[in-house]
Amino acid sequence: MIAIRQKTAAAMGWLVPALFLLFPLAMGLSNVVLLLVLIGFAVTFNAGYLKRETWSWPAIWLMALFAVVLIGTLYTPAPWHWVSVNLSKYAKFVYAVVLMLLFARFPQWQKRALWAFVTAMLFVLVSTWLNVWLVLPWSATKTPGWGLSHHVFGDYITQNVMVSFLVVFALSSVQRPWRSRSNLFWLLVAVLGAVSITHLSSGRTGVLLLLAGLVSWMLVRWGGKKLLIGLPVLVLLVAGALASSSVMRERIALGWSEFAKRDLDVMSSVGHRAYNYRIVPKLIAESPVVGHGTGAYHTEICRFLDKPEWCDIFRWHSHNQFLFFGADHGLVGVLLYVALLVSLYLVARRSEHPQARVLLASLTSILLVDSMINTPLFSSRESHFFLFMMALLVAMNRQPLSR
């Protein structure tokens, strides 16, 4: 039995990095690898995983959130179809905790996993730029040309979420001496990544998330005083980049138009979100403490729509993770999610690792901003990214610097 555990642990040492390599590229295959990792965890499980020092506050809050989801199945009015959808989505909270425990026990896996993800995202970034001139068989978009929107896997929002983090990783990899070749490479990656969001994508969300990540990077890397100088420079750079991008100029103009007509056109991107922000609090007000139960949003929100035929359009999610938790799990769910976010910032603040603390703070800021305009923990690929990267970075930041 000991030999089986040792061989399983050795195999998992490469399966876990494979998971981080695959989820940006191939969700189906990454889920197969995830299943193998969970089986391997069960095979190698021992009392060491239960020791107090292996657990962190983010892990505790994730388990508490999943417990609330489980309890919510006892009083929800939603049919099993919607309950099962939410259980499958939020089971990733537990999977993330499993990864935290594995990374804590096997710290040598941490860099493998991080570099596996970076390798995948470099492939995505290069492919995005090649899309300007070539039709790539693996790319989601097939129309070459500058001034068009290009993305490789999934959708442009998900790609921009992960590229925003890649830009922060690239900037955090720049070290003294400043003129080294590696620094030039990472600066090039950061520029290409940022421009792919501002010039090669039709989405506005990516720009907001990029700003959130960069502000966190500046705050952690430079401190408050330098941030006062750097922030205006960052705003000017982003404004200049947006002004030079015909794609973003059109999207911003469209956004202003949608905002002005938000009460008249609830099917536009901005109008849809504004309508959700008006009606979801009404649903929450009916059961503000514990919510309506797991999956209840998908059916109960239809009672508040102006037109019944809109139900299938608005029932999938609320375009706001806080409202989503509030509808199903009330103030309890929202506070647990806030506690998770705060605990991530605290882990980063107390960390001795210069790069890892920047990455965790930026990841948390990107998640926070994304949660205000989307439901990232309900989205398949986004939840993989946020929860699994969260697990990795929490483990990295909790390791002694000597390791």
Language-model features, listed with the residues they occupy:
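Transmembrane signal-anchor hairpin modules in multi-pass inner-membrane enzymes, especially those
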Residues: M1-W82, L101, R105-K111, W115, ...
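Alpha-helical transmembrane segments of multi-pass inner-membrane proteins
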Residues: L19, K111-T143, V152-W222, V233, ...
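Membrane-embedded alpha-helical segments of multi-pass membrane proteins
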Residues: G28-N46, L87-V98, Q159-V167, V207-V215, ...
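Transmembrane alpha-helices of multi-pass inner-membrane enzymes
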Residues: L36-A42, L340, L360-M372, P376-R403
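Active-site-proximal inter-transmembrane loops
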Residues: W138-G154, A260-D263, D312-N320, F325
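Hydrophobic transmembrane alpha-helices and their immediate junctions
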Residues: L219, D328-L368
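A membrane-periplasm/extracellular boundary helix in multi-pass inner-membrane enzymes
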Residues: R221-L264, P281-E286, T294
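Long extracytoplasmic/lumenal interhelical loops at the membrane interface
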Residues: L264-R278, E286, V290-H329
